[in-house]
């Protein structure tokens, strides 16, 4: 239970892949213009993370260290291809919207990083939990950033949700306020870069306030031992 809690805190907050490790910034900045795009890419990344961590953990004792990275990349590429085919079949509109960023999941440093740093050194269950919480942490940042950009840029929320969830999801669209024209800065990558900066700053402020409320532990003074004669 303690290990699961540690993995959860690391993935969601303490070692969040987007806000702390600053990994996967390319899709984070390019795709998070709407909640739908952000959620779609986040779910795809989460599935690949869990699948790659589990697979790498299973084969870690059979893969020579000299070729482990190419093997890990092949595993990740196979899983990304499966996710891409599923999205092409069941969420074609979203598949077209995300475009090249779906196959680019293969090169995402989060996935290869967790495979090398954690999954290749741990059993299946911890590896799966690590992949899940890291993927959920990345998805959370994508959705929050996508929400902010969509509201500021278009004044809407969950626009195009039917691309991910089907026709019924059209009712989820919310018009927060009306824009005569879109605020392009929020919808383009520079706006995403600014948004990520604000999210990182907000996390830093919260961490500092949390640390300030913690009781300070007084360190015992250590008396130096004289080792030379005067």
Curated annotation (Swiss-Prot):
Keyword check for Glycosyltransferase: no
Compartments reported by the entry: Cell inner membrane
GO cellular component, one term: plasma membrane
E.C. number: 7.-.-.-
Swiss-Prot/TrEMBL GO biological process terms: electron transport chain
Membrane-crossing segments per the record: 39-59, 69-89, 93-113, 124-144, 182-202
Keyword Lyase (UniProt): no
Topology in membrane: Multi-pass membrane protein
Main localisation: membrane
Keywords per UniProt: Cell inner membrane, Cell membrane, Electron transport, Membrane, Translocase, Transmembrane, Transmembrane helix, Transport
Family: Belongs to the NqrDE/RnfAE family.
SUBUNIT field: The complex is composed of six subunits: RnfA, RnfB, RnfC, RnfD, RnfE and RnfG.
Role, per record: Part of a membrane-bound complex that couples electron transfer with translocation of ions across the membrane.
Identification of the protein by name: Ion-translocating oxidoreductase complex subunit E
Species of provenance: Vibrio cholerae serotype O1 (strain ATCC 39315 / El Tor Inaba N16961)
Gene: rnfE
């Amino acid at each position: 239970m303690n290990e699961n809690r540690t993995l959860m805190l690391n993935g969601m907050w303490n070692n969040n892949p987007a806000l702390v490790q600053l990994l996967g910034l390319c899709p984070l900045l390019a795709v998070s213009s709407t909640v739908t795009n952000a959620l779609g890419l986040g779910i795809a990344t989460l599935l690949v993370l869990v699948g790659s961590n589990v697979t790498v953990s299973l084969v870690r004792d059979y893969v020579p260290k000299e070729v482990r990275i190419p093997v890990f990349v092949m595993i990740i590429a196979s899983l990304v291809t499966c996710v891409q085919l599923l999205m092409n079949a069941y969420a074609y509109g979203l598949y077209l919207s995300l475009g090249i960023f779906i196959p680019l999941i293969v090169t995402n440093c989060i996935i290869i990083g967790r495979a090398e740093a954690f999954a290749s050194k741990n059993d299946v269950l911890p590896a799966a939990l690590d992949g899940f919480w890291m993927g959920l942490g990345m998805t959370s940042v994508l959705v929050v950033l996508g929400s902010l950009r969509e509201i500021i840029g278009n004044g809407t929320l969950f626009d195009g949700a039917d691309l991910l969830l089907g026709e019924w999801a059209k009712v989820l669209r919310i018009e927060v306020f009306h824009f005569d024209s879109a605020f392009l800065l929020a919808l383009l990558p520079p706006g995403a870069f600014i948004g990520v900066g604000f999210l990182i700053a907000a996390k830093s402020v919260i961490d500092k306030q949390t640390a300030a409320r913690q009781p300070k532990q007084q360190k015992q003074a250590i008396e130096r031992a004289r080792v030379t004669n005067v």
